[in-house]
Amino acid sequence: MSYTSSQEVRLGQRPDASDAPLYNATIAEAFTRYWKRYATFSGRASRSEYWWMALISLAVAIGTTSIDVVTNGSFAEARTTATGVGDLLSYAWGLAAIVPTVALGVRRLHDTNRSGNWIFLGLVPFIGVIVLLIFYLAPSNPAGVRFDRASGG
């Protein structure tokens, strides 16, 4: 199967369809798109979309842990009790973010022309997570367009 230039979104362009990856996304664009595509498992996500959200999630984890340390007095105590404000915020973020995070991971796999079923590799201890990390770091593959929904009905 060959791909014409009209079927591909070039790097640096903003896609017309919501299924197309947003290359060179800013942190604000990645965050907005993450929540707008909350449970969308079709389509693709660029590396920048994926890694900006990974950075935001890391920042939330650091922030909620910091709140726990400040309110509990020490890091060790903050990690042994699950009753602090930081814990509640962490649980709220985790519950709100689980579905869009999995959906984003599936779309990122699609952008590398891999089936979303590879996401289950993350359930394999150590090796599975490392392999997924390599997949998420992989460059976009134009053949991943096959995971976009057909336009026009």
Regions found by a protein language model. Give the residues of each.
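Structural signal for membrane-spanning alpha-helices in multi-pass inner-membrane proteins
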Residues: T65-D68, T101, G122, L132-Y136
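Short hydrophobic membrane-inserting alpha-helices and related fusion/pore-forming segments
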Residues: I119-G128
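Membrane-interface extramembranous regions at the lipid-water interface
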Residues: S2-I56, A103-N117, I134-G153
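Extracytoplasmic/secreted proteins, especially bacterial periplasmic and envelope-associated proteins
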Residues: T26, A30, L58, D87-Y91, ...
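Helix-boundary and loop/linker segments of multi-pass membrane transporters
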Residues: S42-G43, A78-T81, D111, L121-G122
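Residue-level signature of transmembrane alpha-helical entry/exit and packing/kink sites
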Residues: E49, M53, D87-G94, I119, ...
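Alpha-helical transmembrane segments
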Residues: A61, A92, A96-A103, I127-I134
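Membrane-helix interface segments in multi-pass membrane proteins
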Residues: S2, A61-I98
